[in-house]
């Protein structure tokens, strides 16, 4: 949503392609959507080949590993995401929470299960969000060790120092926003994809036999011959598709067609050429090692493909690309957090708009700090991208399993698919996801526990917040009085009246707001006009201006109002009320309007619906939630807070 009152909806989503142009949107998608998966060649093939080469390697195994990588891209990204999941959008928005709300709309009996799946997917995303910046930037900076003359002069400590400096700069930049520098993301990534594709093509020309890796039977033979060891290789192969979930998560920003075009026309060809080039280069080195009678050594194939001093600009370009990929993940974490807050999965956090014109340009200080601490702990704790790579796939593969489960509910309930078609499409995709998830679970002891710990922590917060809010709402409802009943009582015994308009924020649509009851109890006054206002989040990304406000007149003293928001929107009560009430007798006069907010002081109870420790955790979250005045953008000098004490 834009910040001007004249057009709170922003440009229509369907007209965006015509307004901005396919080329511009596709270029923008290169920097935001494909940054993560586009930088995987730096480390993915190296890690997969390293797993395969632990007991020696032959040419057929190089072809097998490469075949697995290429067909992972084809099956997971192209078939599952591009051809299937990108059709499952919620009014143009994608991602695990958008899919969750779409599934909730299509089923009534399984809403709790659907919310649980969405919460698990969101929690796993945060595990991914901590690892991506650490792994990608560190892997790019490690390319310095491949530059002639620096192989032995650059120490591990210096690599970590440079990586830390880049990441510190990246996180410091978040408070200022990325609107200006963000314009460079697309062009830089276009140069990146052209460069890595071109380098790969050169080595393919030297070793055309590597094209045999395009035949899937090489991958099948590799898995058949390697048993459990092959599963460890598959866990590393999965690194080639990490970041695929961004294709659906960013549909709301660019549209499905530009993302599909970017993948099929630019990104996939560039990635395939680069992986084939790395395989060709490794095959050449294997032949040289065999001819000399020396042992084959797994190396940084990505950087070593470039000749000599050409690695200097390649390292610089790789660092820029990984910073862009990291920025996309950070922005994704902001967007997901806002959705989770709006859907009631997380407490309110301070959200700051960093652009007057782009609703997606937001900054969350709490999320920034938590991500920064997590990223720096990983960089300094693991010390190398190879050590960290094992931690990467678990959360992403888990998210993919959740996504497919939600997609099952959508195609059955929302799209109306029959069982034969549903089974024919969903079962193979789910088996593929479970196969990759199982391969990554094997690597838990190598670092895969890290994202699970992060996801488990976030999941605990979500469960505690949702359960605590339900308990608090039940307590409020048990003590509540209906607004209509209160209005009748006040007509019989009217209190003293004061001029102006009072807006009472309420969590329920039928009950009288607690702030109104406390105002009558302690101040014994009633304003000329009184509005009981409820904020309602609907299961769609955005709400048109015509559907923003629902109003019901109770009597001449009271009006019940509901402000409707989509899960991708940030509430702005004064702006949206002013726009909706710009005509007629209910016109909002800012300087004659007071906002009354009820705030409870919570006390734990050993007899509530949650364990005592969870009561304490919920109270901590409740106390540290963003002030509703800031979150709803209400002028502080127009707010009256009335408190009460509640035992949960």
Swiss-Prot record:
Recorded topology in the membrane: Multi-pass membrane protein
Primary residence: membrane
Cellular localisation: Cell inner membrane
GO CC term (a single one): plasma membrane
UniProtKB keywords: Cell inner membrane, Cell membrane, Ion transport, Membrane, Potassium, Potassium transport, Symport, Transmembrane, Transmembrane helix, Transport
Catalyzed reactions: K(+)(in) + H(+)(in) = K(+)(out) + H(+)(out)
Membrane-spanning parts: 25-45, 57-77, 113-133, 153-173, 184-204, 219-239, 263-283, 312-332, 362-382, 391-411, 417-437, 446-466
UniProt xrefs under InterPro entries: K+_transporter (IPR003855), K_trans_C (IPR053952), K_trans_N (IPR053951), Kup (IPR023051)
Top-rank taxon: Bacteria
GO molecular function, one term: potassium ion transmembrane transporter activity
Annotated function: Transport of potassium into the cell. Likely operates as a K(+):H(+) symporter.
Family: Belongs to the HAK/KUP transporter (TC 2.A.72) family.
Protein name per Swiss-Prot or TrEMBL: Probable potassium transport system protein Kup 1
Species: Rhizorhabdus wittichii (strain DSM 6014 / CCUG 31198 / JCM 15750 / NBRC 105917 / EY 4224 / RW1)
Lineage of the species this protein comes from: Bacteria, Pseudomonadati, Pseudomonadota, Alphaproteobacteria, Sphingomonadales
């Amino acid at each position: 949503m834009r910040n001007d009152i004249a057009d709170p909806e922003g440009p229509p989503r369907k007209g965006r392609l015509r307004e901005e142009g396919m080329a511009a949107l596709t270029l923008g998608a290169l920097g935001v959507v494909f940054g993560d998966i586009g930088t995987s060649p730096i480390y993915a093939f190296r890690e997969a080949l390293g797993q395969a080469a632990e007991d020696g390697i032959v040419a057929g195994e190089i072809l097998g590993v490469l075949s697995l990588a290429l067909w992972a891209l084809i099956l997971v990204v192209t078939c599952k995401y591009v051809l299937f999941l990108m059709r499952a959008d919620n009014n143009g928005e994608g991602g695990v929470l958008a899919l969750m709300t779409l599934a909730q709309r299509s089923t009534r009996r399984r809403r709790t299960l659907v919310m649980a799946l969405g919460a698990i997917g969101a929690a796993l995303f945060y595990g991914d969000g901590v690892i991506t910046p650490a792994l990608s930037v560190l892997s790019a900076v490690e390319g310095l060790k491949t530059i002639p003359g620096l192989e032995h002069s650059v120490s591990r400590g210096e690599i970590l120092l440079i990586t830390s400096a880049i990441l510190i700069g990246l996180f410091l930049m978040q408070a200022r926003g990325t609107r200006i520098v963000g314009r460079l993301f697309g062009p830089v990534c276009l140069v990146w994809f052209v460069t890595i594709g071109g380098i790969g093509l050169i080595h393919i020309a030297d070793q055309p036999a590597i094209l045999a890796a395009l035949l899937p039977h090489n991958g099948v033979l590799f898995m058949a011959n390697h048993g459990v060891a092959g599963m460890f290789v598959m866990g590393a192969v999965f690194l080639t598709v990490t970041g695929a979930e961004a294709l659906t998560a960013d549909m709301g920003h660019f549209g499905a067609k530009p993302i599909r075009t970017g993948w099929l026309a630019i990104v996939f060809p560039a990635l395939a050429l680069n992986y084939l080039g790395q395989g060709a280069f490794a095959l050449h080195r294997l032949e040289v090692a065999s001819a000399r009678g020396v042992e084959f050594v797994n190396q940084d194939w990505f950087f070593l493909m470039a000749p000599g001093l050409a690695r200097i600009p390649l390292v610089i370009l790789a660092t820029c690309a990984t910073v862009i990929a990291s920025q996309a993940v950070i922005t994704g974490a902001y967007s997901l957090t806002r959705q989770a807050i709006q859907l009631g999965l997380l407490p309110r956090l301070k959200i700051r708009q960093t652009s007057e014109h782009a609703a997606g340009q937001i900054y969350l200080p709490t999320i920034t700090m938590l991500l920064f601490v997590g990223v720096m702990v990983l960089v300094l704790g693991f010390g190398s991208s190879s050590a960290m790579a094992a931690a990467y796939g678990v959360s992403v593969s888990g998210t993919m399993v959740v996504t497919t489960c939600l997609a099952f509910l959508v195609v059955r309930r929302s799209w109306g698919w029959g069982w034969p078609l549903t089974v024919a499409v969903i079962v193979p995709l789910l088996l593929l996801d479970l196969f990759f998830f199982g391969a990554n679970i094997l690597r838990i002891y190598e670092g895969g526990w890290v994202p699970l710990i992060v996801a488990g922590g976030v999941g605990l917060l979500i469960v505690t917040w949702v359960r605590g809010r339900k308990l608090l709402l039940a307590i409020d409802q048990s003590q509540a009085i209906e607004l209509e009943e209160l209005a009748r009582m006040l007509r019989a015994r009217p209190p003293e009246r004061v001029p102006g308009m009072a807006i009472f924020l309420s969590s329920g649509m039928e009950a009288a707001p607690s702030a109104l009851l406390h105002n009558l109890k302690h101040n014994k006054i009633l304003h000329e006009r009184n509005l009981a206002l409820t904020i309602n989040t609907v299961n769609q990304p955005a709400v048109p201006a015509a559907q923003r406000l629902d109003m019901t007149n109770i009597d001449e003293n009271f009006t019940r109002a509901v402000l409707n928001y989509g899960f991708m929107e940030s509430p702005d009560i004064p702006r949206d009320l002013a726009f909706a009430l710009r005509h007629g007798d209910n016109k909002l006069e800012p300087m004659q309007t007071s906002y009354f907010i009820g705030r409870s002081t919570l006390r734990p109870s050993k007899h509530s619906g949650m364990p005592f420790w969870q009561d304490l955790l919920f109270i901590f979250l409740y106390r540290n939630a963003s002030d509703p005045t800031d979150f709803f953008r209400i002028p502080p000098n127009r707010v009256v807070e009335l408190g009460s004490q509640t035992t949960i």
